[in-house]
Every structure is written in C-alpha cells, then in structure tokens.
Design a protein with these regions (language model features):
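Membrane-interface helix/loop caps of multi-pass membrane proteins
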Residues: 1-189
Length: 189
C-alpha cells in the first residue's frame, strides 16, 4: 500500500480478523468459526485494491502490467520459497505415492488454483486436511484469482459504463451473497 494512502484503522481490522483465525487453528473450541477472519481479510483486500485501481483510473495512470508486477513481487518470492522447501522436505518424509499427490498440490499452488484442488480432493474441514502442508494456500489462490480477474473487470466497466460503476459493484456484492447462500445449501467444504 502506498504510504500516503495508509489507513491505520484498516490495520486495526486486520489485527481483529487475525485473532479468531489463530485461535481457530490453535484448536480453541470457542473459535470454531474463526475462519470468518479470512473472509474479513478478503473484504479488506478487495476494498484496498479497488480503491487503488479506481484512483489510478481516475488519474488515467493505471497500467495493468504494473499492477500485476507489484502483486507478483509481493507474493511470489515467499510462495515459491514455501512451495519449493515443502517439496524438498516431502522427499524425506513422504512415501512415493504421497509425494505424487503432494506434487499435484504444489502445481496447483503455483497455478493459483489450490482452492479448487483442495475442494475437489480433501476438503478444508476433513480430519485428514491437517496432513496437507500446503492447505493454507487455498486463500492465497482465491486472492490471486481476484487480483488477476477483478482489475480486468474494473477496466471494462470504467471504459464502457463509467457512470454506472457503483451499480456494477452492488451487483457483484449481491451475486457474491447469492453464491455464498448456494454454497451453504450445497454443503461445500
């Protein structure tokens, strides 16, 4: 985030959101819904990214290539380090069959589709999910998918429907809520 645009109250929200996630993963029974903190992080990230893009669009300075480069520099080094380190360690700790499955996980991580991989193969709340070292990358995949597609959507709306941008954003919010409800009805994990 740019220093001049720093919003300390958002850091406060981040701190509040991370606590239930930590307590949930630490196994505290009272925080079984701690994963809601991840949703809060998604909302904060969406808000910040939308603001950054819209400010640059208004000034006619937005370059999608620069946006992607900034995101890649921020996320890819740590992601590749964790994925590669995990693959190397897996050679010493896993059976050949487990390594094959784990390699598929690693590929899904670097392609930013691990959320779909885990959804289709293990499920986040499955007891065996605790044995998946890269399970936590599902949320990063969701975030990266947002970073890849949402700017393109915003540019399209800005270019062709600038006066109706707020209506489109409200439509996205409503569509998102409908998808959440449908996901709950289908017991997606």
């Amino acid at each position: 985030m740019r220093v001049k645009d720093y919003k300390p109250h958002i850091d406060g929200l981040r701190a509040l959101a991370v606590l239930p996630v930590i307590f949930f993963h630490a196994g505290f029974e009272i925080f079984q819904g701690g994963f809601i903190g991840v949703d809060i992080f998604f909302v904060i990230s969406g808000y910040l990214i939308t603001n950054i893009i819209l400010k640059d669009l208004k000034k006619n300075t937005f370059k999608i290539s620069n946006f992607y480069i900034r995101r890649a520099r921020r996320i890819l080094p740590a992601l590749f380090l964790v994925t590669l380190s995990s693959l190397i360690i897996s050679i010493f700790l896993m059976s050949e069959e487990e390594i094959k499955f784990f390699s598929r996980q690693a590929i899904s991580v670097v392609l930013f589709i691990s959320n779909f991989f885990f959804w289709n193969n293990t499920g986040y709340f499955n007891p065996n999910s605790e044995l998946q070292p890269l399970l936590h990358t599902w949320s990063l995949s969701v975030e990266e998918q947002f970073y890849i597609f949402f700017p393109l959507f915003l540019i399209f709306i800005w270019k062709f429907f600038r006066g109706k941008l707020n209506y489109f954003l409200i439509l996205i919010i409503c569509f998102s809520l409908i998808l959440c409800q449908m996901g709950g009805n289908f017991k997606l994990s």
